[in-house]
Amino acid sequence: MGGVTFIGGGSFGTALAIMLAKKGHNVVIWDRNKEILEDINTLRTNTRYLPNNIIPCCVKAVDDIEKAAKESKYIVLAVPSFAIREVCRKIKGFLREDQIIISIAKGMEEETKKRLSEVVKEELYKNPVVVLSGPSHAEEVANDIPTTVVVTSTDMKYAEEVQDVFMTNSFRVYTNSDIVGVEIGGAVKNIIALASGIGDGIGYGDNTKAALMTRGMSEIMRIGVKLGGKPETFFGLTGMGDLIVTCTSMHSRNRKAGILIGRGMSCREACDKIGMVVEGVKACHTFYELKESLGVSMPITTSLYKVLFENGDPKKEVYELMARDKKNEYYF
């Protein structure tokens, strides 16, 4: 048994499916939305999430999740963070122990405050779990734009195996043994990207964006180290790299949602306008509660929480951030 199955037919999963099909892998996509599956099989494109790319004929879309789960050695969980536990429960009865589970979502489980790999391992405890993360917008991956990411696992032999599967001439994959740092960086950067987008929407300039990104990185490091991550991980691809691309790219849905909020929309209105999951919203709620319980300073996250969930005024929150007591830049 070989090949790669994607549980979820969103933009990033579809982009990776295209890339792997070009490499010669047999690829299967399952999604609960049958219109997506029909488009893939008949039009050879994902009209909803990645409409400008042709999907190779060796990619099959199926509506039978049992068939999809049994088809391949590598099972990629390509669904939003809130759906991870649900899809694990759907496929757990169909898996064999030699199948490797690959998580590509970025976030935390809101109710339990657990990292997504922890959630996967709880449900699929017989299977090895690998996390793939990094600065990798779907629109660029699908078009073979040079991209670098990281794979990590609690057992690095599985990360190295997945590294071999996903490596191409345009998609370079590094290994990193710090699974905690990799996942925390990928989750918290969405919070900072939302804040950065709000600054853009208000009309602030490059100075503000630079401040949000660098001070945001301090918040990522503080909470990440507190949760067990290594400081150096946050200066790598899944920390600084992912933060840069998410805060600056025209493809970033978190930044785009932030822009709309900065221009006067409510959080709900902005998310509805984007039409896809904005992971930074749930992440902000999760990490606001985490930093409160752990006693970690995260002022940008706190201000964003007030804007998203307490109808705070974005400009007032920026003023409050700027008016805080003076500090050393490197307080930890």
Curated annotation (Swiss-Prot):
Pfam families associated with the record: NAD_Gly3P_dh_C, NAD_Gly3P_dh_N
Pathway: Membrane lipid metabolism; glycerophospholipid metabolism
GO-annotated cellular components: cytosol
UniProt keyword terms in alphabetical order: Cytoplasm, Lipid biosynthesis, Lipid metabolism, NAD, NADP, Nucleotide-binding, Oxidoreductase, Phospholipid biosynthesis, Phospholipid metabolism
GO BP terms in the entry: carbohydrate metabolic process; glycerol-3-phosphate biosynthetic process; glycerol-3-phosphate catabolic process; glycerophospholipid metabolic process; phospholipid biosynthetic process
Similarity annotation: Belongs to the NAD-dependent glycerol-3-phosphate dehydrogenase family.
Protein name in the entry: Glycerol-3-phosphate dehydrogenase [NAD(P)+]
Species of the source: Clostridium acetobutylicum (strain ATCC 824 / DSM 792 / JCM 1419 / IAM 19013 / LMG 5710 / NBRC 13948 / NRRL B-527 / VKM B-1787 / 2291 / W)
